[in-house]
Amino acid sequence: MKLNYFRLGSSALLLALAAACSPLGQQTAPAPTSTGYADATATRDDNLALGNPSGATADATNYPNNYLLSKSQYTMSYSRDQGKPNWVSWHLSSAWLGSTARQDNFAADATLPSAWYRVGSTSYSGSGFDRGHNCPSADRTGSVADNSATFLMSNMMPQASTNNQQTWAGLENYCRTLVNNGNELYIIAGSYGKGGTGTNGYATTIDQGRVTVPSNCWKVVVVLPVGTSDVSRITSSTRVIAVNMPNTTAIGTAWGSYRTSVDAIENATGYNLLSAVSSTIQSSLESKTDAGATN
């Protein structure tokens, strides 16, 4: 503002000068951060942002074994005939975390088609296998509703206890460590094959044949610093952790020993993982096996 263009009274002049000199009137560029955004705030983002691995659809009649089931807390492909998910996809950032206690309220999923058998809270009883979470309880502690959603039996797979409670849990804990260090994650987990070994020995099914025991449990984790426009920020240098674990009580407890490539998981499952990422970057990322820290 050029003051000499106007005749101002002394009071108005003093007020104008004070405003011009005030720090509130100064425009200061925000300090850059690792994400490119100042004061990047964690948000709850699209659970299926990196793509639909199996092309699942909400058509229960024609695709009962690749049924798309979307919830606020996660998205999955569910298999009616196997009584478990093919895969579950979710976003994890500090925005999903809070102080809600573990609810332990295992329950049948009433949102599955009414004509389908719904696996119940006691369906795994006496089987020798844990009710193994795909999307873990501790990833959804922002509210009782969020945590309770992880205890729906549609989110479970029959998992050997050593795998569920130690090896698989170790990676789950490490994922939350990454979040506490300023990252956000996109996670896809699932299982495939038939036949695992629990505390009662080898089995191919439980619950009178209505739930398939998988031979392998797998997970893919894409790690990004907190920011926005997440898919466009994925580069050939983005850290991607992929693991493939045998579903057996004889499994080792160090999750890092079971790291593999995304390509290897795709070959085993037939899925197209990270399909929303550009094909060039996808090819580069999926051929690598992570060798980063594990704790």
What feature does the model see in each segment?
Residues 9-12:
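Alpha-helical hydrophobic membrane-insertion segments
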